[in-house]
Amino acid sequence: MLREIRPAIVLLLVLTAITGLAYPLAMTGIAGMLFPAQAQGSLIEKDGKVIGSALIGQEFKDDKYFHGRPSATLAPDPNDSTKTVSAPYNAANSGGSNLGPTSKALADRLKEDVDKLKAENPNAAVPVDLVTTSASGLDPDISPEAAQFQVPRVAKARNMPEEAVKQLVASNVQGRLLGLLGEPRVNVLALNLALDRAAAK
């Protein structure tokens, strides 16, 4: 009997060593050599300290910063382990709200968010990505239109000329991947850091 199952056991051990050890180590090593920043998580530093990643969004509430998309991520309720509480951009619990198009809760939240944004900039149409969550809840980017929509608020909060803030947005727009894939986008953290640098001059 052992003679019959020995080839299967040997094959299992060989494939486990190849796919579970050799391949992952090789890919990690190659990625580290060819794309060191990306292999480490595309981390962003300020004054020698890691403050975030270009791949994971953060919540900005202050009027002097650009805001990202709404996030529906949750965290355990510290007062009741059977419940959850809202925890925007919680990378430990990535996910969407799972609210469907007929959901009253979703419709009410959208209306509230749209009304708030229209009060902030009544002369412009509200970009859809400023009121809709992404599937992961961690989207680090917004559309150029969503960034331009926020220019008046940010410029006023920082006492900067709107044109200067618009130029900052324009200089932080990333194009389509390979000129074909995806849509133009603005990384919110990178834009806010550029804004801080410009304001410090």
From Swiss-Prot:
The keyword Cell division does not apply. It comes from the Bacteria. Keywords: ATP-binding, Cell inner membrane, Cell membrane, Ion transport, Membrane, Nucleotide-binding, Potassium, Potassium transport, Transmembrane, Transmembrane helix, Transport. It is a single-pass membrane protein. GO terms for molecular function: ATP binding; P-type potassium transmembrane transporter activity. It is found in: Cell inner membrane. GO terms for cellular component: plasma membrane. Disulfide bonds: none annotated. GO terms for biological process: potassium ion transmembrane transport. Its main location: membrane. The chain crosses the membrane at residues 7-27. PANTHER family: POTASSIUM-TRANSPORTING ATPASE C CHAIN, POTASSIUM-TRANSPORTING ATPASE KDPC SUBUNIT. Part of the high-affinity ATP-driven potassium transport (or Kdp) system, which catalyzes the hydrolysis of ATP coupled with the electrogenic transport of potassium into the cytoplasm. This subunit acts as a catalytic chaperone that increases the ATP-binding affinity of the ATP-hydrolyzing subunit KdpB by the formation of a transient KdpB/KdpC/ATP ternary complex. Belongs to the KdpC family. The system is composed of three essential subunits: KdpA, KdpB and KdpC. This is Potassium-transporting ATPase KdpC subunit. It comes from Bradyrhizobium diazoefficiens (strain JCM 10833 / BCRC 13528 / IAM 13628 / NBRC 14792 / USDA 110).
